[in-house]
């Protein structure tokens, strides 16, 4: 289903008044961490995210969120991608600012601000809608490797070359999907950017070597239901 009614359902006057302040990170965030990743097979067809983004991960801004903040980090990477695609000079919200937005639109109660409560793909869409008025399509995938879901992802990358935020029920770890590869033999891989890294990444290759940026065969996602947020940024 397409989720496109955040402002109508909640009203965004309070959220619109929130100011996203400039950030001073302790070290430069890596850009386009997937840029050094080679395709998983020779030949076949590869579709990837168009446009750059910053790699947000656990603790990258000094906020210690290991164990619960992965959804926020995937959202921050997604927002940095939207801003670049739009040519915007806006700032990426902090975890606390994301929480304040969700409270302002009525999705969460006041106690949510400053908590360690995680967020999922629907909350990620709400924040994207408030900040950038970009529609998203939410897919509920009982089986990620089904022909229907893989067809949706292929069509999405063909049309938008976009950025997908994904989270699961059994596999609760949030991650970004930034590419789709079909081998010459028809095996499907998804390009995953994983925000669970802790520390200071020295390079793109560092993340690739540790497995935080990788191509994953879709059959490895078996056993969990997933929700996917497909950002419909032209």
UniProtKB/Swiss-Prot annotation:
**Which UniProt keyword terms apply here?**
Hydrolase, Protease, Thiol protease, Ubl conjugation pathway
A GO BP annotation: proteolysis
Primary enzyme class: hydrolase
The active site annotation covers 70, 194, 196
Question: By its UniProt entry, which Gene3D superfamilies does this protein fall under?
Answer: 3.90.70.130
Q: Which InterPro entries match?
A: UfSP1/2_DUB_cat
List the Pfam families: Peptidase_C78
One of the entry's Gene Ontology molecular-function terms is: deUFMylase activity
Ribosomal protein listed as a keyword: no
Question: Which Enzyme Commission number(s) are listed?
Answer: 3.4.22.-
Q: What does this protein do?
A: Thiol protease which recognizes and hydrolyzes the peptide bond at the C-terminal Gly of UFM1, a ubiquitin-like modifier protein bound to a number of target proteins.
Instruction: Identify its protein family.
Output: Belongs to the peptidase C78 family.
The name under which this protein is listed is: Probable Ufm1-specific protease 1
The record lists the organism as Drosophila melanogaster
Q: What is the lineage of its organism?
A: Eukaryota, Metazoa, Ecdysozoa, Arthropoda, Hexapoda
The coding gene here is Ufsp1
């Amino acid at each position: 289903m397409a989720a496109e009614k955040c402002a109508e359902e909640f009203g965004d006057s309070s959220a619109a008044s929130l100011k996203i302040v400039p950030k001073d990170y302790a070290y430069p965030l890596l850009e386009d961490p997937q840029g050094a990743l080679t395709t998983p097979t020779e030949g076949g067809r590869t579709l990837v995210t168009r446009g750059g983004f910053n790699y947000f991960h656990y603790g990258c801004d000094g906020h210690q969120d290991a164990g619960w903040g992965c959804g926020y980090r995937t959202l921050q990477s997604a927002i940095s991608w939207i801003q670049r695609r739009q040519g915007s000079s806006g700032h990426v919200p902090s975890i606390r600012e994301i929480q304040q937005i969700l409270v302002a639109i009525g999705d969460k109660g006041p106690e949510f601000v400053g908590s360690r409560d995680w967020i999922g793909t629907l909350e990620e869409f709400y924040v994207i809608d408030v900040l950038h008025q970009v529609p998203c399509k939410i897919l509920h995938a009982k089986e990620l490797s089904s022909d229907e879901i893989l067809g949706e992802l292929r069509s999405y990358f063909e049309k938008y070359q976009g950025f997908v935020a994904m989270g699961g029920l059994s596999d609760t770890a949030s991650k970004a999907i930034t590419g789709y590869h079909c081998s010459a033999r028809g095996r499907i891989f998804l390009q995953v950017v994983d925000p669970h890294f802790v520390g200071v990444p020295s390079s793109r290759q560092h993340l690739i070597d540790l497995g935080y940026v990788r191509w994953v065969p879709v059959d490895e996602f078996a056993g969990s239901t997933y929700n996917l947020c497909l950002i419909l940024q032209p």
